[in-house]
Swiss-Prot record:
GO CC, one annotated term: cytosolic large ribosomal subunit
Family that this chain belongs to: Belongs to the bacterial ribosomal protein bL33 family.
Gene label: rpmG
Database matches in PROSITE patterns: RIBOSOMAL_L33 (PS00582)
Name under which the protein is recorded: Large ribosomal subunit protein bL33
One example GO MF annotation: structural constituent of ribosome
Database matches in Pfam families: Ribosomal_L33
UniProt-listed InterPro entries: Ribosomal_bL33, Ribosomal_bL33_CS, Ribosomal_bL33_sf, Ribosomal_zn-bd
GO biological process terms, semicolon-separated: translation
SUPFAM superfamilies the UniProt entry points to: Zn-binding ribosomal proteins (SSF57829)
Length: 55
């Protein structure tokens, strides 16, 4: 069976609230770490989310 091209990643909030999103990314085309601005409901504003490993 072939290895899947998409992997699950965890996007951790940079606001330090402990909130995170789980999403997928294509490991072959996006080799660098993902950084996205998304809404943090704990901080109640848009902050940067940085890629981390799912434990």
């Amino acid at each position: 069976m072939a290895k899947p091209t998409t992997i699950k990643i965890r996007l951790n909030s940079s606001a330090g609230t402990g909130h995170f999103y789980v999403t997928k990314k294509n490991a072959r085309t996006m080799t660098e770490k993902m950084v996205i601005k998304k809404y943090d409901p704990v901080a109640r504003k848009h902050v940067e989310y940085k890629e981390g490993k799912i434990k």
